[in-house]
């Protein structure tokens, strides 16, 4: 029972400094990566062997969803800078925001383009109940003000503060969207 959980946790313990690239690749050929971090570790092993065609696909998939410790974020970003770009950072920031991982999101802000940084900074402040909500939202460019994630975080923030009229306004505005237009409809209540 729970063998996948054990495998997922094992992926976090695999490091190149303790294992050869070949042994890491062999492990993941037998047990395909379950999480984003596993994909990153496999990509790292392929990179050590110069097999860059495999690296790009794995790193782009793994980067978005990986649970990366604070100390490892800069290391992986530097190691894979040829393979990940600002779009990948934006996808990661979006994933972290929707998953409510606001401390990880805060660490990602410096890697985002200016407009996206303003958007995700506002979302992070709303999620973490930090001060400066109005100021952060005012810095979000107009074309991003109706971002579904920002709308969702504003709805939750207003609801927590008992601002039901404001909550209902956002909820109504978004209820007019079709399911295809909504982002993460599973998160809205």
Feature locations, PLM:
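Alpha-helical solenoid repeat scaffolds
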Residues: 1-189
């Amino acid at each position: 029972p729970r063998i996948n959980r054990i495998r997922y946790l094992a992926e976090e313990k695999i490091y190149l400094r303790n294992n050869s690239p070949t042994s890491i690749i062999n492990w993941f050929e037998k047990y395909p990566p379950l999480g984003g971090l596993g994909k990153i570790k496999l990509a790292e092993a392929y990179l050590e062997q110069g097999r860059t065609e495999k690296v790009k696909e794995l790193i782009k998939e793994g980067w978005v969803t990986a649970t990366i410790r604070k100390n490892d974020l800069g290391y992986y970003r530097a190691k894979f800078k040829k393979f990940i770009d600002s779009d990948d950072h934006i996808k990661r920031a979006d994933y972290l925001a929707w998953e409510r991982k606001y401390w990880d999101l805060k660490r990602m802000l410096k890697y985002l383009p200016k407009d996206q940084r303003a958007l995700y900074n506002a979302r992070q402040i709303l999620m973490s109940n930090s001060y400066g909500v109005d100021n952060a939202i005012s810095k979000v460019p107009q074309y991003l003000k109706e971002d579904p994630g920002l709308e969702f975080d504003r709805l939750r923030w207003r609801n927590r503060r008992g601002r039901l009229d404001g909550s209902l306004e956002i909820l109504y505005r978004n209820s007019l969207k079709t399911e295809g237009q909504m982002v993460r409809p599973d998160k809205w209540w």
